[in-house]
Amino acid sequence: MRCALLSLLLIGSPSLATTFHIDPVNGSAAGDGSATQPWASLQQVLDAGLVQTRDWPEYPYEEGMTLVTVNAGAPVHAGDTLLLHTGYYGDVAIEHAYNASPIIIAAAAGAQPRLRSLLIRSAQNWIVQGLDVSPSFSAPNEQITMVEVTDHDWFGPAWDIELADLDVFSIADASAWGPAEWVDLASSGVDIDAARVTLRDSRIRNVRFGIALSGDDGRIQRNLIDGFSADGIRGLGNRGLFEYNRVQNNLIGDDFDENHDDGFQSWTVGAGGVGTGEVSGVVLRGNVFINATDPSNPLRSSMQGIGCFDGFFVDWTVENNVVVTDHWHGMSFYGMRNSRIVNNSVIDLDNTSPGPPWIMVHDHKNGTSSQNVLVRNNLATDFSLDGIAITADHNIEFSNASALFVAPPFDLHLRAGSAAIDSASASGAPPLDADQVPRPQGAGFDMGA
């Protein structure tokens, strides 16, 4: 009986996942994708119908359509892995490919696959990890958006995409760049205009814009943005999760560039245009925003930390974030409702103007009051809180950072004897701190991140 049952289970089970190989140096279009006969081009595999996937039965896409199988019998199926070996892959576009379960595209062990750009459009269930993406791999180096995940009005939406362990950069070393290069040559990093997209554990450097998320339910986690001349992160979609990212080194000020640079920026768009809608359910947790790791850099800008000026921002959680900046806007929300700003640390990069930075809750630009916002357990050089039912308690406004922190402005761990130790409210305090250490560690909860 057991043998018969096992036979039935094996017959009824799906085929095991297969690993395929792509090698632009040693591969061939005539290969079979095996380790000994790899294919030569990822784009050729995608374009030649070697992936069994799904797409819409016709275009233009209309809501309610049912996906149909395309490339039936192709060697690569949902659940398989494509391993990329060292070499140059050019511009890669994944389109018209809705998988029933994820297909993984990943760097082979020890390999360094290099792409000029990556576009994922009108697709589902792809995981891309371990790749280097830069226009500097091919001459001429031109200003582009290096990684895009996007819907398409004609071909259909994209969703359920994961990007991980990417190294995305305009140029590896930008030390010789001046204002013109930072504004006109620097490419932008990752632009996500699709639902349920994750970008994690990636490095984005020497860019114009870092990460832009306008799709809903996105997850931006544990990324480093280092060297940017516009905005570090833009969060425009609903229910976006931004946690444990580090954004540092904003360059080129208003003398050369009209963009008002932000570590994190959001705004709404409604029927009446910018500032007439809502962005809801966003979580900003454990992020670090540093204007300049070298305050003497002559190219450094004056960065707004978290700048949200065209609300309403509804049901937001802003907790355990660190902002080190040379600007008045440390955290500013113009039009906020039903939200929490808890256990954040905001400090001035230096003691000169502009600054010191504040935590601000303010009226919407149309005069409508912010309402029902909790501001608790924060450490900041200034506070400016206006609105209806704004609850503010257990906060410290400080001018002498050395009395609170180990080595300000960059090491904001609390020093022994700091007034912020064991002084916070337990109510509403996050269970972890910015280092993901459980709270409390002493007799009570600590203030700040």
Positions of predicted regions on the chain:
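N-terminal signal peptide c-region/cleavage motif recognized by signal peptidases
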Residues: 12-13
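Acidic Gly/Asp/Thr-rich repetitive segments characteristic of extracellular carbohydrate-active
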Residues: 24-83, 446
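Short, T/G/N/S-enriched strand-turn elements that build extracellular solenoid repeat scaffolds
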Residues: 43-46, 65-75, 90-98, 116-120, ...
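Right-handed parallel beta-helix
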Residues: 70, 88-95, 99-100, 118-121, ...
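All-beta strand scaffolds that present successive hydrophobic residues in beta-strands
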Residues: 84, 105, 126-128, 158-163, ...
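Predominantly extracellular beta-rich ligand-binding scaffolds that present long acidic/polar faces
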Residues: 93, 310-413
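Beta-propeller domains
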Residues: 251, 260-265, 270-335
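C-terminal accessory segments
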Residues: 398-449
